[in-house]
Amino acid sequence: VFALTMGIFFLFYRFDNKYTARGDQAIQGILYVPDDDSVHYLAREWEYYPDVLLTPQEIKEQKEDYYSRYVSIGEYGGMDLGDKNKSPFGSGTYRMTLVLPEKEKQYAIGLTEIFSAYKLYINGELMGQMGNPDPDNYQEQIQNRVFTFEGKGTAEIVIAVTDKHSVSSGIQYVPVLASPFKVNIIRGLSLMIAVVFMAFTFFVLIFSVYMYMRTKKVEFGLFALLCICVLGYGSYPILHSFVAVKVQPCYGMEALFYYLMFAGVMLVQQKILGGEERIPEILAGVAAAAGVMVFVAEMLCSRAQSATGLYLISKLTEIRSTS
């Protein structure tokens, strides 16, 4: 079992890793895009301007007036660039220059869950936005989006982001650049896998409820509750593909269901194996209590914009966030 698990993890690392995927990466904010219809995961060397919301025109005219550095997507969990003495909340502007083939083509950029409001500019034009990143009129909205544009020669991507409430601020998921067909295929496959998984889990839930009604065995009832937790935790990829949501309570509920899944697994295992020890029940209670505490902490710390509290939550949920 251990060897099989490690083999599966290796396959995911090898074939589903946007940081090691084939394709050129940007160097000092410049990416050369060949004329071969390839897929590019924009993971590294973004030109990043901390603490400011900039438009392409402002960067063009006043670039030397602002501090910038090159960052990788997901390198830092907040706008603080790893400085624990600064607040992880705030604003920042990401910029990348694309050197495209001379023949004009249509491209698409897929953006996944940018926290928590942003404006996307391409070639100086506002292509779209989620929420309102203006700190004085801040409105958060999170949704997976795909934007298309036509380009040749040089193209500039600018993403101005503001976050005030989430555990991880800014761009945490690698954007993808390719033809509209390929970007939609990537998005569609991911969505299809999530839908199939959810449908399978739902049918298992129905079967578990049916068996519990017939046999009155506790293990079937517990397994049905476990399926509900799995559905709650696994629904967010589908939800974010179709609906714009706020940070809370959605992400707090995701964390709650995550911990409740562990509690459910331990209880189901105890009932199936027929053990009389109380240790699994105690551990399940601890996991459930941890889930409730993380949920409440996320709600309170997000509302209070507590950097210390959110750093602690980030550590507690690090495995969940990167899975």
Task: Identify the role of each PLM range.
Residues 1-102:
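Extended carbohydrate-recognition surfaces in non-catalytic/accessory domains of CAZymes
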Residues 63-74, 125-144:
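Solvent-exposed beta-strand/loop surfaces of large extracellular or lumenal domains
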Residues 91-97, 106-108, 144-146, 154-156:
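Intrinsic-disorder/low-complexity, polar/charged segments enriched in Ser/Thr/Lys/Arg/Asp/Glu/Gln
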Residues 98-123, 157-159:
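Aromatic-lined ligand-binding clefts that engage carbohydrates, nucleic acids, or primary amines
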Residues 195-323:
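Juxtamembrane segments at transmembrane-helix boundaries
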